[in-house]
């Protein structure tokens, strides 16, 4: 009669792996490029090009009635038209029946959630590309790294503030008033600035920076917000735009769009803005073995006032 201990070395578990009931989180970058844009809607059946119009203000020169009976010269009213073309984007996932049959996880539900995440991320990147291609950026010169452009500085930020205020741009974010709390400070009514996470260390070094944790009131703050400098509140994302190897020493140049109210617009198509769908196996496959999930959405984008948006090109401090 044999003796010994029965253990996992001589009797391995029938199921060598155990499935955790909780999935690990799927990475998702900060979505910072859409929330500051004005939202417009396009009606169905009247074309894909959406026209947004603005009447320009009248001249304030002259206009005095001097008693001569001569009327002031009439002025022609000027209207500025900005067009946005609605575009459609889509993504599909084809799933074999064996995955659905044998996977422990509810894959169709999870894959649908992934497509929903794709919708939000794709929209954000499209708005990022609009800012990257349609804004006049000014090189930072106030830094100390000796590059062209330099890292971001208070003087550079003040220069963009001067430009926007000189063009009568309106701020987007309200004042956060001072409170009787240690190590906090108020924020002014502010414009929005969008930055890459690579320059967060440089933002901490900017003169007068107020990090988000030092705001007196944390209610309603977006997770993507990083800090406040002068009249700008900075929001950061790992996917914010940059130009590879464009600096004088071959390092990346980061573009930071900075804007006020009604500087940009996002157009959503009525009845088509975001669609998540499912096609069953008997439709997708001749032997009914593959099903399909899909997501699609329509979006139009435009810079609506070039005078109310500017930005900085910057590098990082060495």
Regions found by a protein language model. Name each.
Residues 1-85, 309, 316:
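N-terminal "assembly arms/tails" that initiate or stabilize quaternary assembly
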Residues 42, 98-109, 113, 183-190, ...:
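Short, charged/polar micro-motifs that form catalytic or ligand-binding hotspots
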Residues 45, 53-56, 96, 196-198, ...:
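Structured loops at beta-to-helix junctions and adjacent beta-edge loops in soluble globular domains
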Residues 2-33, 146-172, 191, 198-318:
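Sequence/fold signature of self-assembling virion shell proteins
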Residues 52, 113, 117, 193, ...:
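Hydrophobic alpha-helical segments involved in membrane association or supramolecular assembly
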Residues 76-103:
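Short acidic, glycine/tyrosine-flanked loop/strand segments centered on an H-E-D-like triad
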Residues 175, 180-200:
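Aromatic- and glycine-enriched pocket-lining scaffold segments that form the walls
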Residues 102-178, 317:
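Alpha-helical scaffold segments that mediate packing/assembly in large oligomeric complexes
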